[in-house]
Amino acid sequence: MNAPGYKTGYISIVGRPNVGKSTLLNHLIKQKISITSRKAQTTRHRIHGILTDAQSQFIFVDTPGFQTRHRSQLNQVMNRVVLQSMQDVDVVVFVVEAGRFGREDEQVLEQLPRNLPVVLVINKIDLLPDKLQLLPFMQKMADVFEFSAIVPVSALQNRQLSALIEAIRQHLPGNPFLFAEDEITDRSERFLAAELLREKVFRQIGEEVPYSVSVVIEQFTVEGNLRRIHACILVERENQKAIIIGKQGKKLKDMATQARKDMEMLFGSKVYLEVWVKVKSGWADDITALKSLGYE
């Protein structure tokens, strides 16, 4: 498929919630495929993002934030996704926040494989109030684990991302490319549409509701340069449904409009999007329901 000398490998991006894993993936591949918000638990599935340059193909696996605070079946499924992702890859990227390393980070550290190269990414260096804190923090991290490289970055500002790519490239095996050079993800448009809508719910609604929300795409058809999408937002209680719909349907309309614009940008076509809200009590603790919603 490719001439000798090419490198291709899988890279798992792991860390506690809200360290910027999805933002890092989106900026590495220069396209938004993994949803982001300031709330924990935004990413729930493994997302594959693909970066191909002249020499190598990097297949990134963005994972949910590993955490033990919430014990629902959904959270247990997501933690299993994280652990499994570190067994099926060539390199692990462990993301922490500059100047901050707490118990949640330690819990992820304890799960890191000893038989694979682990690159430490210190993200959000732009938010450090005192830049002189960076070197001591890097030394502190070097003392807790034998990382193959430590790379400070600002994913949001695209700083040091090329250095991170080179640190990862050193550990990729010699393999032909697995995906076409213009592919950026192996996830379907149907899946990405659901994720983009769920992101809008996470960003616009208060603290509690998003954790009880899932999105199901009930219809996805392509008609020339038009994608016709019917989506359903699932919640657990009637009062959550009312919150998402908002007064005279305004919140739901705003979320749908923003999601549609993101879909049009990602798919490169016009999108007709219809969204409604349904109550499905207890779905986050129902194994059968979780499987039907695509949770692994």
Swiss-Prot record:
Residues 62-65 are annotated as: G3. InterPro entries: G_ERA_dom (IPR030388), GTP-bd (IPR006073), GTPase_Era-like (IPR005662), KH_dom-like_a/b (IPR015946), KH_dom_type_2 (IPR004044), KH_sf_prok-type (IPR009019), P-loop_NTPase (IPR027417), Small_GTP-bd (IPR005225). GO terms for biological process: ribosomal small subunit assembly. GO terms for cellular component: cytosol; plasma membrane. It comes from the Bacteria. Residues 15-22 are annotated as: G1. It is a peripheral membrane protein. Keywords: Cell inner membrane, Cell membrane, Cytoplasm, GTP-binding, Membrane, Nucleotide-binding, Ribosome biogenesis, RNA-binding, rRNA-binding. Its main location: cytoplasm. GO terms for molecular function: GTP binding; GTPase activity; ribosomal small subunit binding; small ribosomal subunit rRNA binding. Residues 7-174 form the Era-type G domain. It holds the Pfam family MMR_HSR1. Residues 205-281 form the KH type-2 domain. Residues 123-126 are annotated as: G4. Residues 153-155 are annotated as: G5. It is found in: Cytoplasm; Cell inner membrane. Residues 41-45 are annotated as: G2. GTP binds at residues 15-22, 62-66, 123-126. PANTHER family: GTPASE ERA (PTHR42698), GTPASE ERA, MITOCHONDRIAL (PTHR42698:SF1). Monomer. An essential GTPase that binds both GDP and GTP, with rapid nucleotide exchange. Plays a role in 16S rRNA processing and 30S ribosomal subunit biogenesis and possibly also in cell cycle regulation and energy metabolism. HAMAP family: GTPase_Era. Belongs to the TRAFAC class TrmE-Era-EngA-EngB-Septin-like GTPase superfamily. Era GTPase family. This is GTPase Era. It comes from Nitrosomonas europaea (strain ATCC 19718 / CIP 103999 / KCTC 2705 / NBRC 14298). The gene is era.
